[in-house]
Every structure is written in C-alpha cells, then in structure tokens.
C-alpha cells in the first residue's frame, strides 16, 4: 500500500511494496576504498617488491623501513585557484648497509609528491578536478577455449594469463596433438616442455595422464628423449639463431615462469587457477609451479574427452576491476623499477665513504610516472561536472578501454553485449550511444568490489527446508553465483518472510525458471539492484523501452543546473541519496544548533559548546562552465542532526537531486510546430525564469618575457579610444560588475614590437623622448566573438607577490564572465524517458491552449513521439504528476516496485480528475474547443547542455587554411560554412552560374580575386572577373608530385602560367591602402593575396601527359 516515507527533509508518498533489508552503500566508495587501500597496503607492496636494492657485488644494500605522508601545502580551494595539484609529500625511511665494514646509515628521503583524493573521490591536478575511471580487464588465471577446425571438429586450447610475465598457451591441432606456445612464439610439442621440466621418460609422462592417447600421439611426434635434448629443443624454438646450451635453456625456463620478480599472477590469478584446477597452492606463491602446468594439461585432456567446461571471457567471473589504487600502484612500481636501475649504477660509481641514501635515490622517474598517469592516462579524465549526477556517475564509470584493455576497433559484439553475469553488478541500460557502446558501463546501485577486484552483489539467504527468506545478507561474485537459484526481489512473501506461492520464479545462469520454493538458494535484496544510479532515477522505468531508457539515463547527466531548482513531483526515492553522495550538498559533521546562517557560511554550535564553521561555495565555475553555487537550507536556532543536509548545491532542492522543473504539458499537435519531436513552449517559461541557467566562462591573460622585452599589463594601449577603456582600472584590468560585449577589452596588454629602420623624424623623437617612443603593439585580451555577459570575478597573480607561475610568465590575470541564459528557440530539452526535442517556437502565454479554468499549458509535445518509441513511462508520469500536483503531494515510485495503472487511476479519482487523464482544451488564439479530449499533466523536463548560444555561429572575415587558402571550418576556428559537392549540384540545377562562380572563387580561395573584390567594393567600382582558385593550383601541384606533367593551356594551345605567392610585399601595401591589416605569420591570415593571373579570361583547359 502507498505510505508516507521520509527522504532527508522531504516526505514522499512511496509506492514501494518491498522492505529493503540492506541500506544502499556509499555511492562513491569504489573510489575511496581503492585509494585508501593504496595508501595503506598498495604503496608498501610496491616498495617491498623493489627494496632491498643491492649493488652488483652484493656489498651495499639499500633497505626500506617505513614510509609516511606529510601534509598538503595548499587547501583544495587554494589548489583550484592557483592551478596547482592537491598533493602531499611522501617520505621514505631507508637504511644503507655496508656489509664489508658493517656500517649502517639511516635517513628519511623525500620521494616526491603524491596527489591526494578529495572527500568527493576526485583529484585536483594542476587546478582541474579529475576522476580516475575504474578499468574492466581480463582477470589473470587459466582459461580454456574451444574453436572448430575446417572439418567442423572441436579443437580445445588453454591459456594461463599472468598479471605480468609470459603467457603460457596450450593448443590442439587437427591431428589431435597438443602443443604449447610461450608468449606467442613458435609452438613446440607439450611433451618437450614436460621433459624439460624433469619428467624425462615416456612412461612417467604417460603414467601421469593414465596413458592418455592424445599424449601418446604427441610423444610419437616428439623427437627429444631426455631432459637435456628437450631443454635444447625448447631453447631453439624460443631463441632461434642463438647458441643453445643446457644451462642457458634451464635459466631461460626458470626466468620465464618460476622467478617471482619476472612472473606474477597476483593473488587473484592464484585464486582463479586454484579454483579452476582444484589445486591447494598457498596464495603467497604467485609464480607458476610444476603442478599448475601439469594440472592445466590434465584439464585440457579431460576437455578433449568431453568432461569439464570451457570459459566464457565475457563472464564477470573472468573480468575484474582495476580501480585507482591498483592503477596507481602499477604506475608507482614502474617508476620504482626505473629508479632501482639508477641506484645500482650510483652504488658502483660513487665512493662508499661519501654515499648516503639521498645521493643514491633519484626521485625523478617516480614523480614522472605519477605525473604522467594523472596528467595523460586514458583513465584519468577531466571530471564531468555538468550537474551532481554527472559527477557521481563519472566516479562509478567502468571502462574496458585504456592501457592493457580493449580498443574500440577490435572490440566485437560479444564483448559489448549484456551478459547474464552483469545482473546486479553492471547496469544493462546505461552505456554511451556510439562507438563506445557496451565498452563503458556503470556500476549497479548495490554493486561492490571485493579484494580480488571482482564485482559482488548482495543477496538474502533462503532457508531451503522452511522456504523462508532470512535477513542474512551474502555478497556473491559472478562465478560464485553461478551454482545457485536466485529468486527475484518481488517474489511474494508473507510478513514472516515465507514464500506465499508454491512455485517461485528464479534465475539460473541465463535462464528464468519456475521452480518449487524449496529449491531457491538466494533472493535479490531490491529490484533496483540491477540498475545504475541514473537508470534508477527514472520513474516508471518498467514501462519504457530499453533503448529510450538508455537515452533517458544518459541525458539526465547533461541537464544544466537551473537558477530556480525544483525536485520532481514524481521521483523514485533515490534523489536524496544521489544528491548526498555526489558531494554537491553540505552535510553537518556533528549534531548541534545553527548559530548563524548567511549566504556564504553556516555556523553550528555543537553539543559540547564548540562551533563548526561550514564555508559555502559561491558562483564558482564548474569544469563544464556551469554555475556551482551553494545556499543554506537551515535557519538560525534550528536543531541539526549529524549527517543532515544543511546547504543545497547546484541542481538540488532540500537535499534532493533537482535536475529540471515540473511543467504542465499537453500532448497534441499544434500547427506543425512540434513536428519531428520539436517542442512548443510558452513565453511564461522565459519570463518567469523557469529554465534559466547561469554559465561562467574563464578567460586568462598572461604577461610574458619576450626576446624584445617584457609584455606589460597596462591601461595605456596604443590607438584605443577612451570609451573602450572606461571599464578598466588603473592597472588596465576590467572591473567586477562591468557588462561586456564581443571585442571589449578585458585586460589591456602591450607587447614590444621588433625594431625597424627608423625614419629621420622617428630618430628625432627617440632623441628627444628617449625610450618612451619604443614601438609596442596592442595584444590585449578581448571578449571573443559571440560571447558577452557580466564580469563576476577577477583573479590576479604575479611573480613579485610570490605566486607560482609557469616559466617566462610574470603576471597572470583571470577574468570570469557570467551569462544568464534564458530558454530560447534551438535549445534542447528532454524528459527522463528518452523523449528529447528542440524548441521550435516560443508562443505568447495568451496563445497557448488552456484548460477549462483558464490555466494555459506550458509545453506542447507531439503525441506521435510516444507509440513508436514505446516509452509509455512519460504518459504515466504525466497522469501521476497531475494528480499529485492537485493533491499537493510528492510521489516516490521506485523502479520495478512502484505505482501501477490502478494506483494512478485511484490518485486521479482522489484529485477529482477524469480517470483517462484527459481533459478538454481551448485554443488560446480563437477560444474554440479542440475537437478531442487531450492528455494533460505535469512532466519533469530538463534543459540539456546543448544550448543554441554555444552552437550558433556566423563569419564575415576570418582565417584561411594555409595550403588550400579556403576558409577554415567550425565555430572553434571561426570558420565558414562549406559549400560542398551537393550544394553545388543544387545551384547547378537552377543554372545560377554567376552565384556559383562567386562562391567557388572570390568568396573562397581565389586569393587575388578576394583582394580585388574588396578593393572594388571599397572604391564603389564594378566587381572584377574572378581568377583561378588556389585549390585548383594545389590540385595541379598534387598531380605534378605524382610525376604527371600537367599544364594549363588556353584555347589556342599556349600555356597559361600560374604564379605562386611570391609577390607579397606590394600586395601588402595595397591591402594597407584599403585599411586591411595583414598579419605577418601565414597561418591564420585574415586575407591573403597573390599575383593576379594574366589571360584569366581566356578559355582554360587541362591537358596532362605522363613525363
């Protein structure tokens, strides 16, 4: 039955029928736990693997005793301001022992800085917030596979994959012989390897495998008869062309598999091998053993006889997660190994008397490895900070790409597909559309990572004898779960936990079966354990098609934080948890009473009388340029409990996630303005700032040292009117609060110009005024084309004040410009069910369709967008939202355990609305009734980050490409619109030859023609005939580079010479006369000119002959 439930400070009418026996875990613990493991264990493991380091004689030994972390130099916010990393120094306590004279030197050595994880599970690297994504990789272990030969007979194979070291493979050929390959080299009969390992005679080998005929056949093919021959044969195959000796072969074999420094299958590899082959080798033993090799061969022989099972590589029992801790440990180990080499060399070179640990240890390889990992690894990503949900899901992202993983091109359908072992571990819905589909996934809500890196999911234990579900929770990994029957979370139970029905629906491998209740082993803890956080935020998910649910989950992450936030009327109950764990809201550490609450700080007096201060972030710029702002939701004198939300962040309301707004929607066509998913909205949404968002852009200007002198930030800029300088302070930096438009000066800066030959007049001035007359050019920071707004903050850094700046930079000024963007035509909007569209028209409020009581609807959506897309959830949300708004309720309808149709009808009746959820609407323009009843209700709509202001673009004069001399493309390059092949056809179809000629020549890449045309426009003359486009010249040059003798001949067969851009000087003069300033560097020139072509009017044809 529906019941009221409290979510933080908000109560919702919840329709959930299932009491969840286990709380949701902290949603970013995957990041935090992994990094904590690294600091406590991973770092020590890596250090113990490399230390102690001995020199080549064995006299000197550098051992490691302990390590400690210092305090970070700056706070998190200071790091963001100063563009530095949030990190702490790592110090090692080491001991240098001289074994000859027994001398011991102990000291503490600084080992560089290690980036620290913030409370929110992120890292600050060079001032930018970054996330390290967990990687899904093939687990170390032993794998058996099966393929078909040409005749259709099964061929089996086996591979032992280590964490690091050589791969050991076994394979069959169609003759039924077993071969081995080591590290993808040439294959050798497996019996050669067995002999080399010490099983010399045929009898011993046959005995070991009970006279197996496959082995007997392989022995016939084997030419070696004893260990020595086998070793030499083995060495020849692995190192062809080198001299094979018994000792070298023995050493090679030992190094390949039995040396812990070169071969490591990690604890997880040992666990997998023991489990698959039924061995009991202790977990400390992480290299291969004889037992591993013989048991692997044994299992392969069993497979040939039809016993045992092959492995599916996409099963989550065979794929594990490498999270931040392990990734960083591997990187750190790489650095340590490089350092070890340096230490050894220094031990041999330096004098023993003067040696100290500080002299030996070179930390550069370590700091370089760590820096490289955080700065440029594929898995260390710039955090998606569009809204709190985007932050949260980015930290829970699982990627199969990256170093040691898959590549997009090689990944087939098999790897990308949903597998039954994903249940409760990886979300089957949320994944990107496009080339990464299925390679990037998201952790399911209850998923956790065990010590081996496998994802586990919780289940309730079932007492089979009684048929009763217990409240005992067991976490199972994918391979452990395979042996059990698992019932669904919504299997009917009585109040004591007994199954009501005799037969229960349960999962077993990929099948869903109906089985007697006494065969059930476990039961799901919650219906939402299958899905990720973003998917579990979609109400009525069970009524949506999976493809649209995927779009809904992905688009919630793109919702822009609005100025006025509003939590959804129809939610799923997960909004509170998602907002809390994202780190966007402020949470009270201890209980107490609010003493002071202002916009920027909350003070709470704890029960022991001391005061906790919480600083709030105000109008900060997020990574994506959205506005990050926190505001208090507690009042002075209010009692606050520990872990209670006391301030809202972006996209939250009363501690709940609030990505969009609840708006009244009608599903009807309107004059074709909602054709093809377009959206018609009311002007009310613009006027009332319903979908208004704030966007903050950062611009920076640095004054550097140049060869000709230092740049200077100043108000004194040459050739600039006083009007342009009116908002600059006396240093030449814009004041906070100024409204700026494109091309306004933000920071005045001048750069020294190169000395040129001075005229006599200039020499006289120089003599009178001294240095002052030195030429400088204006290199001020200006507002880019198409941007505008208000200056909200200015930050200044200078070397003189002791700020850390990059080399060569003396001063740095950052200016932040905020824009208030109201919703407008061309903006993209979406619901939570994958129903997205672009706003096509904003209608005056009075013209919108209205209800019988005169209320105009706010948005009109096209009903044809629903049936074919099969996302009926939006209609149910619309009905439920209307009823809930009328009754003044908030609803929680969890996924697969929420309100059904009957509940919706009941609520509509309660609210005195028609059970159909439809009503009569009137046309706002004429006042007439529409013919049919129309579905109306409240839907939660989001404004997405694809805003028209960022996409719209126009160009007049701009940069040209250097080679083709055609305008560049794209908004970022201030490019033009390409008039391509198909567009040319369109003009050809109309026969508009002059328009076409103009587009393909003077408006594009006829360099001389461009300038002449500009000249004639300036002088008011007729526009001259176009010349030959630069692209044509490039084509000729390309053909000539292929050794084709290509020339242009006129109608009377005499050659027309094409001039190159060598006559630049006088054309620059001409351009200057016209008031055009041509830059000196050719890349990105505004206008380029070359020699005009003679005889261009003549008939031109292309003739080619091979040279």
Swiss-Prot record:
Lineage: Bacteria, Bacillati, Bacillota, Clostridia, Eubacteriales
Listed Basic and acidic residues bias regions: 1062-1075
Family: Belongs to the RNA polymerase beta chain family.
Catalysed conversion reaction: RNA(n) + a ribonucleoside 5'-triphosphate = RNA(n+1) + diphosphate
Protein name: DNA-directed RNA polymerase subunit beta
UniProt keyword terms in alphabetical order: DNA-directed RNA polymerase, Nucleotidyltransferase, Transcription, Transferase
Record-level Gene Ontology MF annotations: DNA binding; DNA-directed RNA polymerase activity; ribonucleoside binding
Annotated region described as Disordered, given as residue ranges: 1062-1081
Function of the protein: DNA-dependent RNA polymerase catalyzes the transcription of DNA into RNA using the four ribonucleoside triphosphates as substrates.
InterPro entries tied to this protein: DNA-dir_RNA_pol_bsu_ext_1_sf, DNA-dir_RNA_pol_bsu_external_1, DNA-dir_RNA_pol_su2, DNA-dir_RNAP_su2_dom, DNA-dir_RNAP_su2_hyb_sf, RNA_pol_bsu_bac, RNA_pol_bsu_CS, RNA_pol_bsu_protrusion
CDD domains to which the protein is assigned, alphabetical: RNA_pol_B_RPB2
Pfam families to which the protein is assigned, alphabetical: RNA_pol_Rpb2_1, RNA_pol_Rpb2_2, RNA_pol_Rpb2_3, RNA_pol_Rpb2_45, RNA_pol_Rpb2_6, RNA_pol_Rpb2_7
SUPFAM superfamilies referenced in this protein's UniProt entry, alphabetically: beta and beta-prime subunits of DNA dependent RNA-polymerase
Organism this protein belongs to: Syntrophomonas wolfei subsp. wolfei (strain DSM 2245B / Goettingen)
EC number(s) given by UniProt: 2.7.7.6
GO cellular component, one term: DNA-directed RNA polymerase complex
Biological process according to GO: DNA-templated transcription
Subunit structure: The RNAP catalytic core consists of 2 alpha, 1 beta, 1 beta' and 1 omega subunit. When a sigma factor is associated with the core the holoenzyme is formed, which can initiate transcription.
Enzyme class of the recorded protein, top EC level: transferase
